[in-house]
C-alpha cells in the first residue's frame, strides 16, 4: 500500500495550464504548483511483461538522484510484491494494475479501468490512483461521498472492491481532513471544463491533481 509520508495536499490543473492553489501542511498555508509525489517519475518506470513486474529504467538509474531512485525502487518493490502475491496483472500499455487480463477487463468510456459506478472509474498505478469522471452526475456522486462522515472509509471500500488493492490507512485518514477541499476543487475544475471529461490523480502522500481527457 502507499503511505510514504504524512499526508499533504497539492493541487494543480493539467501541466499545460497549472494554477496556484493553496496548500495546507501542518496547519500552515502556502502557494505551490509543485507535485512532489512519485507519479512525476513515471516516465522512468517500465514494465517487464515477461516477469509481470515494474522496473526502474536504465535512464532512471542514470539521471535520477540516489535519494529519489531509492524511494521509487522501494515503492516498486512493495508494489511488485503485492502483484505477485495476489496474481494481479500489469497492463503493459497503461501501466495500470488490474485483477483480470487488460484485454478482457474494460469499462464504458475508460477501457481497462474498474467501474465504481456509472460514469466513475478508477485505475490503480504503482504511484497511486486515477479517478475518471465521464459525466457531471458522476462528479456529483463522488462529491456526495466526500461530504459524508466516513468519506475515506467509503472510498477505500469502493476502490478495494473494484481494484483488489486496499488504500493505505494514512490515505483513508487524510480524506477526513481534506475531503471538503477536494470536493470544492473537483467542483471548480469540472465547472471550468464542462465540455471535457476530467480525471483526478491521487498519490500516496495525498497530493491530488486534476486533468482532462
Region spans (language model):
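Intrinsic-disorder-associated interaction segments
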Residues: 33-34, 61, 65, 69-72, ...
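Short hydrophobic membrane-inserting alpha-helices and related fusion/pore-forming segments
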Residues: 150-173
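Short loop/turn hinge sites at secondary-structure boundaries
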Residues: 79, 86, 164, 189-195
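Glycine-centered structural positions embedded in regular secondary structure
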Residues: 6-7, 12, 200-204
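N-terminal propeptides/leader regions of secreted preproproteins
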Residues: 8-120
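Canonical hydrophobic alpha-helical transmembrane segment
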Residues: 9-14, 169-181
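Bacterial N-terminal signal peptides
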Residues: 1-5
